[in-house]
Amino acid sequence: MIPTEDIIPIVKNTIAASIKFNTHRGYIGWSSCDNICMDMHDCLDMCTETLEMCGYMTALEAATYILVSGVKLASHADSSSGMLTDVIMYTYALIEKCTKEIEKQDKQMRDQALALIIKEAKKSVFDGWIDWRYDLLKCGICLCDEKSAKKLEKGLDTLLENSREDYFPEYTEKEDLIVSYLLHRHLYGKKNTQKELYQNIALNELRIIAIKDAMEDKNYDEAEKLCLEKANAEETWHYHSSDPEDWNNMLYDIYKIANNTEKQIAQAKKLLLMGNEKFWDVLKQIYNECGAWNENYESLLDELKDSKRTVCYRSILISENEKKRLLEDVMENPYDLFYYGKYLVKEYPEQVYELCYKEISESCAQAKDRREYKKITKNIAQLIKWKGNDTAKSLIEELKQRYPRKPALLDELEKVEKKL
């Protein structure tokens, strides 16, 4: 175990050395950025161990240093791999753990931790990263009492005033309103700050809080109203199926918790037809419970087909072993034929071979270089694996005759012909 007093120097030296080693001619490429991120992860692991050993302030100070270093890196390194974002999110989670532990300690430590967070959040490194700046300040809210809250409010006022010169000051204004509300809610409670919450209900983050409050109070009509106002206003392409706080996903949760089966079915069907295939199983379960699955099965598949959510529709056809429907859909639209063909070739070999012949012929007419020719012959090789040797042989002969002046294509065709 590393002594607590050594953690911060080790973290600072590790990150500095890693940045220096991975900087080449003043530039940090994506692989070098990932190397630095791995070193940062090691530092975060040290911080976690320190936190577990009750070194609360040391862990917090080291974690905020890692955060600031990560934000700096985001401004000038190639962080396209996504690893840096993961490090930063992990760091926020660790900072929050630190402040939750410090919240239980004496006032002196709480005030010290709050002062550290405010000081770090004011740094110019967060200019241009407004959400990250205010995410850090949110971590400090749990440390506030009415007296120390004035320091946080003063810091918020300073940041808001400085933002007047920004190109988009409204971003800072929005974050300021959110943090201010969360601070007031922490100090005065949910009921005493409800008016402030509804005054700023246009902000998505605060609307979500209001919805969750309404659900907690079993006021499902209010939760539904707040959710519908946004869900009905947005286009379907805004839908984020994997986001639990997407308005449409939240609306389904409201109906489920309220035990409103009719609205649950309607919303689940809506989400399915928007391409969220997990709601197929949801609908199956609900319909089975009321003995109505068989009578709704075919019509539900028809609606899904008409929705033009091809990937979702075909995925469900595969899971339900609906080979005939899948073949019909692939024949109408040979999109990703060589993926879906493996599910069809056993029962419908001739139809699949014919589709492959046509698809490869059309692709070859558009191909212009060896890279594209390789893709074509890869598909021919797949056709051979599916025991479509006669079709593959005829196709190769036709392509040779049709394109005698494409030596690169002829070369690739000769290679795949050897597999026959």
Report each predicted region and the residues it spans.
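Eukaryote-biased, non-catalytic alpha-solenoid scaffold regions
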Residues: 2-420
